[in-house]
Amino acid sequence: MSRRDVVLTNVTVVQLRRDPCPCPCPCPCPCPCPVIRPPPPPPKVEEPPPPKEEPPPPPPPPPPPQIEPEEPKEAPPPPPPPPPPPPPPPPPPPKPAKELTVGINGFGRIGRLVLRVCMEKGVRVVAVNDPFIDPEYMVYMFKYDSTHGRYKGTVEHKNGRLVVDNLEINVFQCKEPKEIPWSSVGNPYVVEATGVYLSIEAASGHISSGARRVIVTAPSPDAPMLVMGVNEKDYNPGSMTVVSNASCTTNCLAPLAKVIHERFGIVEGLMTTVHAYTATQKTVDGPSKKDWRGGRGAHQNIIPSSTGAAKAVGKVIPELNGKLTGMAFRVPTPNVSVVDLTCRLAQPASYTAIKEAVKAAAKGPMAGILAYTEDQVVSTDFNGDSHSSIFDAKAGIALNDNFVKLVSWYDNEYGYSHRVVDLLRYMFSREK
């Protein structure tokens, strides 16, 4: 070890010093002299430095002054929700067409006669739809008619179209109204003559496929009912896209009831229609679960039946709602029917006064709708008559001045078809 060695022990520094021998002799140590050397002084042990005192931790910051929480203020009421946006405006109705065009759905009795009447009155038919009849068969069915005779013009088919008096008519064979491409033939007014699509929802399939308006040729459960000469002015082009032309019997009864009620007042009444048989009946006895009597042979029987025609008058003449009801007898004749209206009058009137009131209406505001006759007529005399109602002055009777029976004839096919076309033209005139 050198003269100065430093030993680090437990972090304590000890310094050792070796002094020379105190012996006076010059010999090298160890010295042989007997001199007793004093023991070396104990090594100085340095005291370890006192540990450094760590500075005391800083005093914690004084707590923030406690702020007493403010009493919660009542929250202001939330602002009212914004008003709901207005509903989108309805789609604008199609622009008025320059010419009335007609489509016919269903080429049965009424469908074919509507086409005949359109040809007579110069109304252009652009399409006929019937899934069960092809153009060749349409020619035959339109040309020959056992009740109204042979069509006097020309009828043929060409390139899949029906051609009547050189007018080409498109033929479609779609099963559902929504499938018929009415938009491809110029958005016509559609005559719904199948007897199937009677409600607004069912008939609106025509609208979705391009029809401008729809006239249902039967009473409807919910469509507005319009009878020419009675309430056609109730037609609203802005809201009515599907309307009903009511039934042939309602078209006969309503004009007569309107005249009598406006002039004398009807307290109550019962109607009976003696009605020609129709295609819904059986030629011989057959099954008819809903109407057992209706299943009996039409040519062999007088068959009592129900009808809603009298009650329907209350829909077109609201003042008579609940005052009329009626029934029908189906009889073995192919066409022309007759209404018997038995009613109690509010104002006493002679039968002569009643006849004069009906005669004046037939010559005036109801000309072409209501007719008057004093001839000794029978049903076939009115086959092909275009009026809705022909008052038979010689057939009616009166019990007294307040209780009368009134009789009026109607061609339930041809007269009704004329009213369908008249309603088409009236509705079209309201769009201009």
UniProtKB/Swiss-Prot annotation:
Active-site positions on this chain: C248
Catalytic activity: D-glyceraldehyde 3-phosphate + phosphate + NAD(+) = (2R)-3-phospho-glyceroyl phosphate + NADH + H(+)
InterPro entries linked: GlycerAld/Erythrose_P_DH, GlycerAld_3-P_DH_AS, GlycerAld_3-P_DH_cat, GlycerAld_3-P_DH_NAD(P)-bd, Glyceraldehyde-3-P_DH_1, NAD(P)-bd_dom_sf
This enzyme's EC code(s): 1.2.1.12
Bias type Pro residues, positions: 56-67, 75-95
Associated pathway: Carbohydrate degradation; glycolysis; pyruvate from D-glyceraldehyde 3-phosphate: step 1/5
Tissue: Expressed in both head and flagellum of epididymal sperm.
GO biological process terms on file: flagellated sperm motility; glucose metabolic process; glycolytic process; spermatid development
Region described as Disordered: spans on this chain: 40-101
Sample GO molecular function, one term: NADP binding
Site positions (Activates thiol group during catalysis): H275
Subcellular location: Cytoplasm
Pfam families given in the database record: Gp_dh_C, Gp_dh_N
Binding-site positions, NAD(+): R109, I110, D130, K175, Y197, T217, N412
Keywords of the record: Cytoplasm, Glycolysis, NAD, Oxidoreductase, Phosphoprotein
Span list, region Testis-specific N-terminal extension: 1-97
One Gene Ontology term, aspect cellular component: cilium
Phosphoserine carried by residues: S350
Keyword field contains NAD: yes
Role according to the record: May play an important role in regulating the switch between different pathways for energy production during spermiogenesis and in the spermatozoon. Required for sperm motility and male fertility.
Comment on protein domains: The testis-specific N-terminal extension mediates tight association with the cytoskeletal fibrous sheath of the spermatozoa flagellum, possibly via interchain disulfide-bonding of Cys-33 with sheath components.
Stated family: Belongs to the glyceraldehyde-3-phosphate dehydrogenase family.
Subunit comment: Homotetramer.
Protein name (record): Glyceraldehyde-3-phosphate dehydrogenase, testis-specific
Organism for this UniProt entry: Rattus norvegicus
